[in-house]
């Protein structure tokens, strides 16, 4: 049980007077196709879903079930940054832009934010702390990781139907062997990130 995320960070903040705490996480920094997604989640301390964990440690079925529980009782917002925005401002800044959009979309304005990673978005004016491996340590960040991943996976499945052959329903845009082979055979789609090396190399090969 020690490996499961806890409510410890949130409890400490609540004891200091912070009543509305959002967990924030992103997904999709590594893919060569599709936008980057982020989720912001304010959990109800009286309704924390059982089994919350880092989304990468859960099966797709389990993620879906827990995401439905999160939606019932929590304030949830999804933000994204497009492939073109990723190309223009780089993936780190685009990830932070998606996080900012997710936070701004919450129904309630949080008075403290817990962010997965080691950097707080520079434009965020709300008090915040970055927690390395936060999705495995804080239930609020774990909830955000689940919501971000389930939302982005759904989008990539939809895009995969529009652009068959790349396997996006399975690889979510990550550079798997199937995806890279399809990139060579079928070419670059509007949803590929043109500044990412495998895509850039095909576009500008001699």
Where are the regions that the model predicts?
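RNase H-like, Mg2+-dependent phosphodiesterase core
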Residues: 1-206
């Amino acid at each position: 049980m020690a490996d499961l995320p806890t409510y410890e960070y949130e409890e400490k903040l609540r004891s200091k007077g912070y009543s509305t705490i959002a967990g924030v996480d992103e997904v999709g920094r590594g893919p060569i196709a599709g936008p980057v997604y982020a989720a912001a989640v304010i959990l109800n301390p009286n309704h924390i879903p059982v089994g919350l964990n880092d989304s990468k440690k859960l099966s797709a079925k389990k993620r879906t079930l827990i995401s439905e529980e999160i939606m019932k009782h929590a304030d949830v917002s999804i933000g994204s940054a497009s492939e073109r925005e990723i190309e223009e401002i780089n993936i780190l800044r685009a990830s932070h832009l998606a996080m900012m959009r997710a936070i701004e979309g919450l129904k309630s304005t949080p008075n403290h934010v817990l962010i997965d990673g080691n950097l707080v978005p520079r434009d965020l004016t709300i008090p915040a702390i970055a927690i390395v491996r936060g999705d495995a340590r804080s239930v609020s960040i774990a909830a955000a990781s689940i919501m971000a991943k389930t939302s982005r996976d759904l989008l990539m499945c939809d895009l995969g139907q529009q652009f068959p052959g790349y396997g996006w329903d399975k690889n979510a845009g990550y550079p798997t062997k199937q995806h890279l082979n399809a990139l060579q055979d079928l070419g670059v789609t509007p949803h590929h990130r043109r500044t990412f090396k495998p895509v850039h190399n095909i576009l500008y090969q001699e």
